[in-house]
Amino acid sequence: MAQPPRLSRSGASSLWDPASPAPTSGPRPRLWEGQDVLARWTDGLLYLGTIKKVDSAREVCLVQFEDDSQFLVLWKDISPAALPGEELLCCVCRSETVVPGNRLVSCEKCRHAYHQDCHVPRAPAPGEGEGTSWVCRQCVFAIATKRGGALKKGPYARAMLGMKLSLPYGLKGLDWDAGHLSNRQQSYCYCGGPGEWNLKMLQCRSCLQWFHEACTQCLSKPLLYGDRFYEFECCVCRGGPEKVRRLQLRWVDVAHLVLYHLSVCCKKKYFDFDREILPFTSENWDSLLLGELSDTPKGERSSRLLSALNSHKDRFISGREIKKRKCLFGLHARMPPPVEPPTGDGALTSFPSGQGPGGGVSRPLGKRRRPEPEPLRRRQKGKVEELGPPSAVRNQPEPQEQRERAHLQRALQASVSPPSPSPNQSYQGSSGYNFRPTDARCLPSSPIRMFASFHPSASTAGTSGDSGPPDRSPLELHIGFPTDIPKSAPHSMTASSSSVSSPSPGLPRRSAPPSPLCRSLSPGTGGGVRGGVGYLSRGDPVRVLARRVRPDGSVQYLVEWGGGGIF
């Protein structure tokens, strides 16, 4: 039976409602509430925790870790301690049956017993091998796996290499997504634990399976988050030690990789070039393994990085575009940098596709060129008259004032949609770029992912009500959070927000004092701030950026007055 899909933690108690009785056939690990266990995480490492809830139907446990965080962990990723009296009971098949050639062997470390055929790879019989003691696969991986790469020397490194020649699960039986980035069974790497492809994992070029950094023994430097600029071949495909080769990076790839790594670690969207981007790159210059770029003098690194950030508008967004400091840079989309297929004499011709999120080999965004449309021509007898590009003929734009005013009128006259069933309706701004960080959009009642991970990319801060987003744009502070409007708005902000409320059918209209936001936009107020009627009467240009329905049924619009632009 296939493992159930990855579950999410929820604050509601309905997650632990009595479920249907679990089937009695098949092995069942002995897990109970209050038991201390080791849980394997998405980084390939084991962490100590205590079981709080056991769900036999879903085969998951709610585990509380040493930092008081609680997450759901699949049974297959939990390693309990051996119990007294079970020395003759196989911890895999839960059977005491012994036949010739398939005897029970006990691990010297954890004292768990295994049938020879139940262990992967097959365990030696008692008395066989170099010594009389034997260590199981779980203990070897628990000792040898490390952040930055597993042990490369010593007896446990040699034992781990022998264990890695076979996988503890069927690779062909995994259900992968379209991009071959994640599978339904949450089985990755040599350890068989969970994982996230964009967080320090390497993909084998032959079998396309993903492997944790902590379980590999071939890396000379630790990985950065989202770094896929490697040719990697696992022990299973090679039948021996792993093989890895660094791909050549360009300056745009270096800038993208550094920004993605910083955004994952710091949970921010924008970073100062002189205070964060350049110092991080300089301090980790040798660890980046830049190949030909590593010989770049220190004086040229700043100009090369800055040029890459400014010349690739499809990847990066600067603070100048959002009315912030021009030295701030962020990613348009929080995705790892795309990887080109290897080329040249050192490239392997059998390198398959599947590096990009879409399943094919991703090309660098900076080199995409759209074919320009040919100009329209009108044929007449004896001559051909040029009409210009198609957009200039077919889409003759109206004057800006008329077009924006018509847009506002259509938005205001639109029918009111029914209120959202969720009391926390997230706000989304203009289509294009979302200024709010991903973690800040996780409201207190929204579930988080099951395997959030202990690395800096995972945090439960988004689920606590007293933690707000670390950085908000002035526009977002006004429309999304009217209760914490700053006393003085920046002078560079030219957009203001207007609230237009309409009662929903069947819902009584609530009488409440106007918020500071509504008072600041009401007609007749001082300070040179006019309401929507005043702007329309003066003929000022207007643009509707967004529309949302509040829990009480009222409709609010985010309106930009005066022709200023933030995008």
From Swiss-Prot:
Keyword Coiled coil: no
Impact after mutating residue 71 to A: Abolishes histone H3K36me3-binding
Function: Polycomb group (PcG) that specifically binds histone H3 trimethylated at 'Lys-36' (H3K36me3) and recruits the PRC2 complex. Involved in DNA damage response and is recruited at double-strand breaks (DSBs). Acts by binding to H3K36me3, a mark for transcriptional activation, and recruiting the PRC2 complex: it is however unclear whether recruitment of the PRC2 complex to H3K36me3 leads to enhance or inhibit H3K27me3 methylation mediated by the PRC2 complex.
Transmembrane helix as UniProt keyword: no
Disease: A chromosomal aberration involving PHF1 may be a cause of endometrial stromal tumors. Translocation t(6;7)(p21;p22) with JAZF1. Translocation t(1;6)(p34;p21) with MEAF6.
Modified residues (Phosphoserine): 420
Any one Pfam family match given in the protein's UniProt record, by short name: Tudor_2
Biased composition (Basic and acidic residues): 371-386
Start and end residues, zinc fingers (PHD-type): 87-142, 186-240
Listed name of the protein: PHD finger protein 1
Residue ranges, compositional bias (Gly residues): 524-534
InterPro entries listed in its UniProt record: KDM4-like_Tudor, Mtf2_C_dom, PHF1_PDH-finger1, PHF1_PHD-finger2, Tudor, Tudor_PHF1, Zinc_finger_PHD-type_CS, Znf_FYVE_PHD
Gene3D superfamilies hit by this protein: 2.30.30.140, 3.90.980.20, Zinc/RING finger domain, C3HC4 (zinc finger)
